[in-house]
Amino acid sequence: MRKLNSLVSLVLAGLLVIGCSNQNQTEQEILSAQALYTQAQTQLEKGDYASAIASFEKMGSRNVQANLFGEQIQLSLIFAHYKTGEYYKALSLAERFVRAYPNSNNMDYVHYLVGLSNVRLGDNFIQDFFHVNRSSRTIESIRNAYGNFQMIVRIYPQSQYVNDAQQWMVYLLNRMAEHELSIVKFYDKRDASVAVVNRVEEMLRFYPASKSTFDALPYMQKAYQRMGLKDSEAKVAELIEMNKAKVFPKITKPEYSKQF
């Protein structure tokens, strides 16, 4: 019995030593995580995005650090990849973030970054510089961006990003209308009258206040004329006459804030 008691005492003593050792190790890991996080944030604030990405990814691969700063690490990585022009990577990380933190208080910020990433994917520096109209380019990223900003306005009406989101929505809606007008012109050149009429009808439904929709009406009138539908042609002519004095506001592209 005495040997057993001695053995139990030795085991308990050993567990106590191990417990203290584990506690010290955890405290050291926490301090290390805090130091690395501070370093990564400093790199991010200085615009050294490549180094910040490397630091945040290093933290994300360690359990203690990932548990302590997991959400903030992912937010910072989304932002850093956006700033380096890696928009598809930013979108991928954002999608992962939404799955991992569905109840995050930063969800409006994530949707805002996703929207800006999609806008950037629809941009082209050279075409911007020479004022080239991009309405005929693939419009998918623009539609996605509109949906991202619309989500902020609808679901997060108190968000600090609502005003910016609304401005982007006006601009993007105009871009989509311009794209539809380019398709109408394409069909008109090929005398595809039915396609012209169908497309303009969609514009009247989805972009009724757009200048591009008004500019599409003469193509619709001509299409009805080609098809010999005089009543429909006359109705469109009347619609054109009613709106000929209408002044459309100039829609300019919102500026990216310095932060983004």
Swiss-Prot record:
Pfam families: YfiO (PF13525). GO terms for cellular component: cell outer membrane. Residues 1-19 form the signal peptide. Its main location: membrane. SUPFAM superfamilies: TPR-like. It is found in: Cell outer membrane. Keywords: Cell outer membrane, Lipoprotein, Membrane, Palmitate, Signal. One of its GO terms (biological process) is protein insertion into membrane. The keyword Signal applies. A lipid is attached at residue 20 (S-diacylglycerol cysteine). InterPro entries: BamD (IPR017689), BamD-like (IPR039565), TPR-like_helical_dom_sf (IPR011990). A lipid is attached at residue 20 (N-palmitoyl cysteine). Belongs to the BamD family. Part of the Bam complex. Part of the outer membrane protein assembly complex, which is involved in assembly and insertion of beta-barrel proteins into the outer membrane. This is Outer membrane protein assembly factor BamD. It comes from Haemophilus ducreyi (strain 35000HP / ATCC 700724). The lineage of its organism: Bacteria, Pseudomonadati, Pseudomonadota, Gammaproteobacteria, Pasteurellales. The gene is bamD.
